[in-house]
Amino acid sequence: MGHEDAVYLAKLAEQAERYEEMVENMKIVASEDRDLTVEERNLLSVAYKNVIGARRASWRIVTSIEQKEESKGNSSQVTLIKEYRQKIENELAKICDDILEVLDQHLIPSAKSGESKVFYHKIKGDYHRYLAEFAIGDRRKDSADKSLEAYKAATEVAQTELPPTHPIRLGLALNFSVFYYEILNAPDQACHLAKQAFDDAIAELDTLSEESYKDSTLIMQLLRDNLTLWTSSEAETPARLMPLLRRRPLLRLPSRRRRAQG
């Protein structure tokens, strides 16, 4: 199959919500060992995100049910649920291993621009994080270590190659902070990372281009939402973090929209 046909079929599969087929078509594009266009990168990301997202949602639901049945002492149901959860985890692992192989063998070695390098290392960090969400013992530690390494590699490039308001840099900070909070159980580091990204972007908000304004401000609001959630209890929050939510006003999105429309 040719390059253009693979891209077209990936778009068609997206419209039809047949994301497994979208993945297969974008793997053909990714295997060409060249730096993908922005559109191609996004198609690849959307394809895998939908495939993995459905399984992650299923895993959370089944895990919640398992915990409820365990609390009730329903051992026979718990046995069935554990087997079913394992099936979902096997699917999750297969998807993660698949995209990580594509990244390591094709996309990361072929990345030329700083934007591409950040994008791919961020995705690598994301999918190792997804593995760490359900893995246990040494496997969890290995996935967490690899996720941390990938996020750090992405951050190193982002800080020199991308402005603080760039949506990919902001998205990296968002996901990296979630990694600290959920995987490493390090809320202090999570808050500091998210706060720094938010503050750096706020300082340069007026220089943000119109085409990326919507994406960037949305991610900034997600950073703000996480900070609000993570610092919601003053009794549990280090005192040095509490001024954060009192200092910064909410983003004034409507005024910028009026200027853009005018």
Curated annotation (Swiss-Prot):
**Family matches, as Pfam families:** 14-3-3
PANTHER family given in the database record:
14-3-3 PROTEIN
Q: What family does this belong to?
A: Belongs to the 14-3-3 family.
This one is known as 14-3-3 protein homolog
Species for this entry: Trichoderma harzianum (Hypocrea lixii)
